[in-house]
Amino acid sequence: MRHNFKVIEKKWQKKWEDAKVFEAQDFSDKKKFYGLVEFPYPSGAGMHVGHIKAYSSVEVVSRKRRMEGYNVLFPIGFDAFGLPTENYAIKTGTHPRQITDQNIARFTEQLKRVGFSFDWSRVILSLIHI
């Protein structure tokens, strides 16, 4: 019997999202743990294996802390200004804000599909409104 991993993963990710399993609780009496990864530059066509490698260790520790009963804050964000974004916009001939919004949407979808347990209710953006 073969498993359809795309269906199974999607099902469980939806259940976890609906149950807000990965959201930190404000004013909780539980011990606290703060996990943070370097925010990606949304200045390319998408994630690569380096992103997965860089985030996996903090992902593992964050999940372990949740299982130990900690209130875990593990936000994600996007470092969406500066030369990488400008260079990618010039390369593609697209306005920096438009390309940034498109890439943030793509990165978000990819990070969710991988199954990282980020607190998506607390996304941090380092961009100025353009």
Show which residues each predicted segment covers:
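N-terminal, positively charged nucleic-acid-binding surface of large information/translation enzymes
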Residues: 1-128
